[in-house]
Amino acid sequence: MKPENKLPVLDLISAEMKTVVNTLQPDLPPWPATGAIAEQRQYYTLERRFWNVGAPEMATRAYRVPTKYGQVKTRLFYPQPDSPATLFYLHGGGFILGNLDTHDRIMRLLASYSQCTVIGIDYTLSPEARFPQAIEEIVAACCYFHQQAEDYQINMSRIGFAGDSAGAMLALASALWLRDKQIDCGKVAGVLLWYGLYGLRDSVTRRLLGGVWDGLTQQDLQMYEEAYLSNDADRESPYYCLFNNDLTREVPPCFIAGAEFDPLLDDSCLLYQTLAAHQQPCEFKLYSGMLHAFLHYSRMMKTADEALRDGAQFFTAQL
């Protein structure tokens, strides 16, 4: 689609979203011109520092957990001594960017609002790790904490998965993996999904939206996919194209959040319509005037804070 035919997104977003877009960080270096992933990761981590300031203080612990691929870093947030459940958080970043630091504020707020222990899993990024390694690492971490729950003072009788963007796909894929392979890590009480991608190859929103402001042009999406997948056949895997999985039975309750000007919005809409049509418990909420990745900006935007509160409230209602 010719760029000129796309919607003038930056003219249409909300006032608070425009404030975020226009926020300058004087000490931030320019986006790396080489395109090297290592440099992009470093830039992303630096850029997110500003947005992670001022998060709630709470007991926090860092542990490395074993997987068949080696050890994976995790970060545990304890908002209270007696948590009613444990929520595993998977960060976004197109499978190639992001870490526990870039999403620290999101995890702290989620722990504070839910009063549940939140465990961030620093799964191995792509292209170093290819599908389905990240999912297998997440599942291995869940199993490890389930077996060692007493040692870590966590409640693993009820768990949940949460994630943004690529992390949302990993969250739902991990929940389906546990179901399909009959792995017991505790009851999956809910899944929280903020503006994820779930397997659409094309859509109206992917055509009309996406640009340099969100890194989600069709070319960008293709690049993320090629970095993540092992081969072309993986595109149809039920753990990548989640619409190829069985969404008619035993899907944990899903909170599905969409951003109005997100190219991936149709993925969320289709997921909600599919689950609702088959009487699977789910809730969809559209956040008006928002761009993809708006969850990061709760330091400045009430809507981002609201979206985190909504997800936390949905999860605690399932307990």
From Swiss-Prot:
Q: Which residues form the active site?
A: S165, D262, H292
Q: Motif Involved in the stabilization of the negatively charged intermediate by the formation of the oxyanion hole: where?
A: 91-93
Cellular component GO terms held in the UniProt record: cytoplasm
Pfam families in the cross-refs = Abhydrolase_3
Tell whether Heme is among the UniProt keywords. no
| Compartment(s) where it occurs, according to its Swiss-Prot or TrEMBL record | Cytoplasm
Could you list this entry's UniProt keywords, alphabetically sorted: Cytoplasm, Hydrolase, Serine esterase
The record's NCBIfam families line, in alphabetical order, gives: PRK10162.1
Family, per entry: Belongs to the 'GDXG' lipolytic enzyme family.
Function recorded in the entry: Displays esterase activity towards short chain fatty esters (acyl chain length of up to 8 carbons). Able to hydrolyze triacetylglycerol (triacetin) and tributyrylglycerol (tributyrin), but not trioleylglycerol (triolein) or cholesterol oleate. Negatively regulates MalT activity by antagonizing maltotriose binding. Inhibits MelA galactosidase activity.
Quaternary structure (record)? Homodimer. Interacts with MalT and MelA.
What is this protein's record name?
A: Acetyl esterase
Question: Which gene is the coding source of this polypeptide chain?
Answer: aes
